[in-house]
Amino acid sequence: PTARAHTASHYPVSMPAQAYLGKECVCQLRKGICDQSCVQDMLQTPFYIACLRLSGRRCVVVGGGEVGLEKVEGLLVCDGDVTLIAPEADPELTQLALEGSIRWEQREYETGDLDGALIAIAATDDTDLNIRVFNDAEERAMLVNVVDVPPLCNFILPAIVRTGPLAVAISTAGASPALAKRMKREIGELFGEPYAVLAILLNDARGWAKATLPTYQDRKQFFESIVNGDPDPIELLRAGDAQAVRALIEDAQRAYAPV
């Protein structure tokens, strides 16, 4: 349907895991009544860290508040095909729908909304709805995340530091998003633009390395000689001397080229 401008009087926010205490257990432990055991269990979970290519893939966000906006924006950055399910939405989400950046289904969630989707994210203050989205996604073997409720997630969203082509993910296994945000800020200050520029310059040399150096080990040594070289390419870039880094790469190419 066509998106309609609507200023919501209440923006749903995600429910913390504590909201499930005393309710029927919905996690993999199936304890009957929730006692929060699974929250502690999440800290022991060996998560498989991966980067997903979302370009053109359908991603569903349920919930039109500030948290939903945050998740929608994260998916759009990665070129996801985003559908928002919410009877009301934050004004910024409304604008994204009006400009065609997302599809807004302005109504309550329905089970069929997940058909054909890769990812579902529930960002509402309705515990029963969050559980329903989780169960529907699990039945479809989909990736699903109920914001701030780790037991109702089969993947968690790390805090991301993005600088050019670089992306650094910080995860606390759902234990403390606040700590992850602090780490994100500090890592962003430490690994700034010079690292992004170096990544671009090294990527420019990848074609030469693949065409010229016969083995993986040869290519590994070539790139490590630049990254860990003397002078330090990061320090050169901090001084604004990208040309000196290009010279380092050219010197390494001459040194590693087969005779």
What is each stretch, according to the model?
Residues P1-M15:
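Extreme N-terminal basic, low-complexity initiation segments
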Residues C25-C27, C34, C38:
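Cysteine-centered motifs
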Residues C38-E88, L93-L96:
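Hydrophobic, well-ordered beta-alpha structural blocks that scaffold small-molecule cofactor pockets
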Residues E66-V67, T127-D128, G174:
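Residue-level detector of alpha-helix initiation sites
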Residues A97-D115:
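Glycine-rich, highly charged phosphate/nucleotide-binding loops
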